[in-house]
């Protein structure tokens, strides 16, 4: 495992606190000693915490918080971590080859847990996988600086057409094979409510994590 990497965890603290605390606990366990910088809107206990205050949630503020964490890191590589993702020890043991590439795992599933929706594991499209990225620090900072404006914060969830481009947009990116899938939740408290819960490839069970009900019981 390369030690020249920092996990940057960023959150608006709007998910259910008990749920997010479970996410943080397993993240800390799976990090296996990799340094963590957390950037939050309320104080949390995870690595070196930077609390920016309750600036509101939006895609703009999400990337600003990430930028603040990346600027504070000193490592060559950054592993992104979000407050509604389940990663694994395998994920944080990945060793990047190049600094100017966004590396993301091939097997990533969304689990919708919203009311009145079908609860299944749904394969996640490549362009939505920023929260699984491992990338060179300088390349990531360049991407963020090109997206963000002069305003420090812009609260308020944007409409889909007004959201900032995805980090992968027109960037070098590579998908790599992972044996343990990464899981991201779509909850009623989440910023992104859009999900195709009628996806023809939705499944009820995935390796390592188990069934939909297993995961819901463990984390929700």
Q: Model segments located where?
A:
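Short aromatic/hydrophobic "clamp" motif used to bind/position activated sugar donors
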Residues: 78
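Active-site-proximal specificity loops/subdomain of glycosyltransferases
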Residues: 38-74, 91-93
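Short, acidic, metal-binding catalytic loop of nucleotide-sugar glycosyltransferases
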Residues: 21-34
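Conserved catalytic core of nucleotide-sugar-dependent glycosyltransferases
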Residues: 92-212, 216-219
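Short loop/turn segments at strand-loop or loop-helix junctions that form parts
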Residues: 8-12, 40-42, 51-54, 105-107
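The conserved acidic donor/metal-binding loop of glycosyltransferases
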Residues: 82-86
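A generic structural signal for alpha->beta connector loops
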Residues: 4, 33-34, 46
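N-proximal low-complexity "stem/linker" segments adjacent to membrane-targeting elements
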Residues: 1-22
